Amino acid sequence: MKRCYLYLFILIEMCYLSELSAKSCGKVFKGNDPAVRYVGRTLVSSDGSVSFDWVGTYWETRFTGGRLSLIVSETGTSYYNVFVDDELHRVVKVCGTDTLINVVSGIDKRLHSLRMQKRSEGEFGKTTIHRFVLSASGQLQASPTVRTRHIEFIGNSLTCGYGVDGRHRDEP
């Protein structure tokens, strides 16, 4: 029983310290910050976190400071396209609970647009964004334009591109 309490105490300390270290690295914003726009099916929790699992769901914002990280939880393993200033910057793998993920770093500190789009099917995991972490000089700013029209492709894996990255059908 004592061992159980010890493990619980260590787990709580690790969660607290990861949140503390994220806060000490820069500015922290909730997942539902008004400067972040989500497109797709999402669920906003009372603590300000945002959850989603549908492929194609994305969030976008603008930011300064040259660095942006996320504190996220994932029920499985998901992959995301990260676009900076409308150019594919990288592909990010998200897994684990209360994980600090570096989305963008090493770019200049001017204003940049950022979009992060889920590319994995929902069956491979649900993502919850708890916090955005920016550099100490960083700020989030809302995207200036709201798209009034979207093109949606509805169909099977041939039309929608399911499995274009996998070597076999069980890969996300």
Model-derived features: positions:
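Bacterial Sec-dependent N-terminal signal peptides
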Residues: 1-27
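N-terminal secretory targeting modules
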Residues: 20-154, 158-172
